[in-house]
Amino acid sequence: MEIKQPDVTVTENLISPEPDDAFIAIPVFIGYTSSLVNKTAIKLNSLADFTRSFTLSFPESGLMYYSVRHFFENGGQQAYVLSLGSDETLNDFPSFITALRQVWITQAISAENDITLIVTPDAIRFNRPDTSYIQRNLWLKFWQSVLNLCKSRRGIMALLDAPDDPELAAKCLAQFSSNDRQWGAVYWPQLNSAYRDQAQNPIVLSPTAAVAAVIQRNDNQRGVWTAPANIALAKVISPVHSYIEANALFNPDGASLNLVRSFPGKGIRIWGCRTLENTPGSLWRYIQIRRLVSYIEAHMTQLGRAFIFEPNNAITWMKFKGQAYNWLRQLWLNGGLRGTQEDQAFELLLGVGESMSEADIRAGKMIMKIKLAVLIPAEFIELSLTFDTRTTR
């Protein structure tokens, strides 16, 4: 709106800080490279970016190189790499786990707001025919160490590898106890890739790099709320193990991993979309549900930050609620929320007596409550977002 006065022109524009709806699941590859880049996550938009940053000699032959290559050749568009050191410094599984626990790694991840997935392809280096308690304990420590990295910021998930031995993998699933299960998904088995070593043998890769690309592509093409499953992988000759060996690993009721299996005439496909969560009836057992809710939470938080500079009153609440409503309604129309009617899909609460008390307002809190039907119409989960308006004054 333009207001004209003698010698003065005032133009008022409505600034609507809408979040970027082109949500992309952006992974960070954490592991060992030919060269070390000190304590910084390097952003990649192509395989060429990787070779410029990490390659000392040609042709490149490191496991991280082939994992990143597999990511881009499966349709990945953007990723980060966080180098723990040169390949020569990786000694054994315990040292890898110790490296993942360094404080600077958490700091490097939290510094990049668009990272939402963690991939650690070097874990497959430590597969042993040993099914002892010691080996099992190392894998459980590895899983928890990566899940701890997911706490660097809300909304980050880990794509995890499992032991190559089916018996050991089943024991790990049965004995893994953690409060962070919903933030991890395990994929099995390893893959014989189409890439060749100097002896012309297939290079064995973790499935997680290709899975990260599939999730990223699925978000763009179908939406974050759709299951990243039954999707073919490129540059794969075969899984290292047949799905027939995995009877104890794919569990419809308890903790489960996700298989990569071969279908005659249909290629090598991801078969499953489960997190490690094993609570019966929990919505967090499904990757797409966990990521959808994180997606909504992130967008609503970003939207709400624009209003913490405003007075904590009914006018501000109306503006915030209006923009949040429009975004959620569009998400529902796109198929992201369940229900044939709007009130079956979501509900927004913001105001005194709805989401806040007078005491909350005096304390400088602006609280929005969001009810979401993410699986069944009119069966809601509730998010509560609290913004501290006092810190801005």
Label the model's feature ranges.
Residues 103-109:
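Short, T/G/N/S-enriched strand-turn elements that build extracellular solenoid repeat scaffolds
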Residues 85-99:
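Aromatic/His-enriched, Gly/Pro-containing loop or helix-boundary segments
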Residues 128:
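Glycine/Thr-rich phosphate-binding loops of Rossmann-like dinucleotide-binding domains
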Residues 64, 96-103, 131-146:
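Well-ordered, non-membrane alpha-helical segments in soluble/globular domains
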Residues 1-88, 110-124, 148-393:
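Structured, hydrophobic secondary-structure cores that serve as assembly/anchoring elements
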